[in-house]
């Protein structure tokens, strides 16, 4: 009897596998945005994101990532990264228990020194020229009271505020 139950259970779970269910996690416009992001990263247009694609994409943004950093990014995937895997990885991250990490890691892609800061001019350029482009006014609003004296944006603190709210500060 227990083998029948196990068999029935396995059959029930099959339709809910990550590849078939991942497209149901997002609406059509979100999937389109992910596709645009995937295509931006897939520099050689072979339908897969590999280490060279990541390197070329980051180099196009003025970054020179180390081999170790690239390996770390690639090791987050259990196998080759085609669009379905890319979407699955984002789906798992976005529906995970700590979306704060997802946001922080998105900023960290542009923080070569892993300092927790991105210079305001560089971040403004990225935000106004890539993906869902921000207007200068939207960037100004995001920067309000968040740029230090050296002109750096503290994305670690910004992410914390996004997820947990601002702490009261006595200036």
UniProtKB/Swiss-Prot annotation:
Modified residues (N-acetylserine): 2
SUPFAM superfamilies the record matches: EF-hand
Keyword annotations: Acetylation, Calcium, Cytoplasm, Cytoskeleton, Metal-binding, Motor protein, Muscle protein, Myosin, Phosphoprotein, Repeat
Domain EF-hand: start-end pairs: 29-64, 98-133
Residue list for modification Phosphothreonine: 19
One Pfam family per UniProt: EF-hand_7
Subunit structure and binding partners: Myosin is a hexamer of 2 heavy chains and 4 light chains: interacts with myosin heavy chain MYO19. Interacts with LUZP1; the interaction results in inhibition of phosphorylation of MYL9 by DAPK3.
Record's protein name: Myosin regulatory light polypeptide 9
Gene behind the chain: Myl9
């Amino acid at each position: 009897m227990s083998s029948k139950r196990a068999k029935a259970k396995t059959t029930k779970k099959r339709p809910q596998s990550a590849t078939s269910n991942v497209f149901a996690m997002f609406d059509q416009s979100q999937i389109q945005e992910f596709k645009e992001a995937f295509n931006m990263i897939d520099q050689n247009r072979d339908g897969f994101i590999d280490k060279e694609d990541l390197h070329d994409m980051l180099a196009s943004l003025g970054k020179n990532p180390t081999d170790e950093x690239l390996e770390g990014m690639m090791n987050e995937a259990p196998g080759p990264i085609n669009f379905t895997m890319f979407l699955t990885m984002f789906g798992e991250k976005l529906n995970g228990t700590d979306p704060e990490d997802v946001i922080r890691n998105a900023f960290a892609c542009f923080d070569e020194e892993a300092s927790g800061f991105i210079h305001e001019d560089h971040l403004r350029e990225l935000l106004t020229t890539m993906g869902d482009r921000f207007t200068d006014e939207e960037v100004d609003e995001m920067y309000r009271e968040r740029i230090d004296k050296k002109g750096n944006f503290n994305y670690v603190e910004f992410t914390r505020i996004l997820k947990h709210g601002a702490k009261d500060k006595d200036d």
